[in-house]
Amino acid sequence: MKKKILFWVLGILGVLIIGGGIYAYNVYSSVSNTLKEVHQPLKRDQNNSNVGEKVSKSEPVSILLLGADERGEDKGRSDSLMVITLNPKNNSMKTVSIPRDTYTEIVGKGKSDKINHAYAFGGVDMSVATVENFLNVPINYYIEVNMEGFKDIVDAVGGVDVKNDLEFTQDGHHFAKGNIHLTGDQALAFTRMRKQDPRGDFGRQMRQRQVMQGVIKKGASFSSLTGYGDVLSAIQKNVKTNLTQDQMFDMQKNYKDCLKNSEDIQIPGDGHKAADGIWYYYVPDAAKQDLTNKLRTHLEVTK
């Protein structure tokens, strides 16, 4: 199931693509308009006409999946950070989940802090720059999802089914072990809990993937959804990306076989309070360099 994480990346933007790129003609216009609305280039790429060449040429690419914790007028912080690298030459994919409390330099801020604070300081542009600097790999594309509004997407597809391996209560919702059905509000609480989980941030990331995969499962039968308008509306309000519509379709066509050889990577480190009393996750230089080497090799980056 973890191999379907790419289908979340593509599917949350154009759920119809998941069914192999075939979708009903009568909703094409609505889907096209939605994908145009969610398109938001990075500031660094606004005058770069070659930004989409990697996808069209089927070269190795990287994607930053960013879940933003935005509530009301509060810009919030990045609730989750996941880097996906795809190499269509050997049909392989690597997924790296970055703990939100990772201590690193915040590019453009002139100081070090938790990596998820980059979003609060400078939005997706600063987040991309900070992740690039932390991993020492280029980030070609990003997909930003407002996790507060993600509940609307879950409700729009009729809720999702997940298998819960840890009984807990969060935000007034109780989650029993086993197979459970989640509404949008429940899904939001389900993906936010981490303090009761002995796996910490890694357990929370696992639950996020479960919910995302549940959305994709519903999206695979998009043409049968009576409320596809609600789905598109929720996506339009809560998703931003620098991928264009054509790039999404090229990616689905040219990179889908990467799912056949997928590797999930956890970043080793140690979490503890610093002298300022704040809890950080520290990644040893050697471990970070090993990760950098692995990703740069996968992306065929030589300089």
From Swiss-Prot:
It is an enzyme of class 2 (transferase). Residues 1-4 are cytoplasmic. Residues 26-303 are extracellular. It comes from the Bacteria. Its EC number is 2.7.8.-. One of its GO terms (biological process) is cell wall assembly. The chain crosses the membrane at residues 5-25. One of its GO terms (cellular component) is plasma membrane. Pathway: Cell wall biogenesis. Pfam families: LytR_cpsA_psr. Keywords: Cell membrane, Cell wall biogenesis/degradation, Membrane, Signal-anchor, Transferase, Transmembrane, Transmembrane helix. GO terms for molecular function: phosphotransferase activity, for other substituted phosphate groups. It is found in: Cell membrane. Its main location: membrane. It is a single-pass type II membrane protein. InterPro entries: LytR/CpsA/Psr_CW_biosynth, LytR_CpsA_psr, TagU. Belongs to the LytR/CpsA/Psr (LCP) family. NCBIfam families: lytR_cpsA_psr, PRK09379.1. May catalyze the final step in cell wall teichoic acid biosynthesis, the transfer of the anionic cell wall polymers (APs) from their lipid-linked precursor to the cell wall peptidoglycan (PG). HAMAP family: TagU_transferase. This is Polyisoprenyl-teichoic acid--peptidoglycan teichoic acid transferase TagU. It comes from Bacillus anthracis.
